[in-house]
């Protein structure tokens, strides 16, 4: 029993399997466009019928639920691959059900909502321009992005595989009072043409505790939306279905709910039990494909 890890030069072989995804397209396509790092495992290196796309935060799974070797690989969760695992998102319902069946109580289903901005530009005017309480909006540079991650517990450097990639392919804005960062809205992922002729940029939002409910997030988000509109991008927003505060802010800013989806994560987001020594890795072949073989056989 074996699975195949594709080199980036062959990622395109797995791309058609993810075309059915209606969620997190910026996260998925960003890997195929080499904007963010990722790894792709398939059941067949020439004509894959199922694929696992691993990137920081979510692991995306597409294709047929009948790919037994890939399902075994996922169930075992080799430590060499699953260090960044946060949760699975499957691109079709039969595959999601298969993953739940394989993992049993090790995973729980988390309902998620996806939004896309489709609001009135003029309705955001109140969040543009000078602020009476001295709040300024600045675009994130490297120093501010590093401070944002460090001081507000954000993950731009993690999502993008480093700040160089974030600055080259992503963007974001922060609100400040003096030199203190009070709120942020930044791209967790960006991808090219995918929705109605536009690209997508998925927003991550945070306000420092002492400054919440004072419009700081709305100002940073407005700058983010304006940047998206100027660069042919649709701003998208994801949140857990029970996060009412996030949903209320999204709707207030003009985001409209898209199709819901599900994330499969461990209870309490505790670390996944990882396998050691169950899969052997062969040297890459001439095309750069790496074969992973189960030591337990078929």
Residue positions per predicted region:
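Short amphipathic alpha-helix that is part of the acyltransferase structural core
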Residues: 1-24, 121-161, 277-295
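Glycine-rich acetyl-CoA-binding "A-motif" of GNAT/NAT acetyltransferases
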Residues: 47-48, 180-183, 245
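Conserved catalytic-core motifs of GNAT/GCN5-like acyltransferases
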Residues: 108-119, 256-273, 279-283
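A conserved beta-strand-loop-helix scaffold within acyl/acetyltransferase catalytic domains
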Residues: 161-178, 182-208
């Amino acid at each position: 029993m074996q699975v195949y890890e594709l080199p980036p030069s062959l990622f395109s072989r797995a791309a058609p399997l993810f075309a059915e995804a209606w969620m997190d397209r910026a996260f998925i396509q960003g890997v195929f466009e080499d904007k963010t790092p990722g790894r792709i495992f398939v059941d067949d290196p020439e004509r894959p019928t199922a694929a696992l796309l691993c990137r920081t935060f979510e692991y995306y799974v597409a294709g047929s639920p009948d790919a037994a070797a890939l399902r075994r690989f996922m169930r075992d969760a080799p430590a060499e691959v699953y260090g960044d695992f946060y949760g699975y998102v499957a691109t079709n319902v039969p595959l999601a059900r298969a993953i739940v069946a394989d993992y049993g109580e090790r995973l729980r289903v988390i309902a998620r909502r996806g939004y896309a901005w489709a609001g009135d530009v003029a309705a955001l005017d109140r969040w543009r321009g000078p602020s009476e309480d001295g709040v300024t909006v600045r675009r994130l540079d490297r120093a501010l992005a590093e401070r944002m991650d460090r001081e507000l517990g954000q993950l731009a450097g993690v999502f993008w595989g480093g700040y160089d990639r974030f600055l080259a392919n992503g963007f974001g804005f922060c609100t400040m009072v003096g030199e203190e960062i009070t709120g942020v809205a930044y791209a967790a992922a960006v991808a090219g043409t995918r929705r109605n002729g536009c690209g997508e940029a998925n927003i991550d939002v945070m306000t420092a505790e002492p400054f919440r409910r004072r419009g700081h997030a709305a100002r940073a988000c407005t700058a983010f939306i304006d940047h998206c509109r100027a660069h042919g991008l649709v701003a998208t927003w994801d949140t857990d279905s029970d996060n009412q505060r996030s949903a209320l802010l999204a709707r207030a800013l003009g985001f409209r709910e898209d199709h819901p989806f599900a994330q499969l994560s461990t209870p309490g987001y505790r670390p996944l039990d990882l396998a050691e020594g169950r899969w052997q890795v062969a040297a890459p072949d001439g095309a750069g494909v790496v074969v992973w073989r189960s030591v337990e056989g078929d």
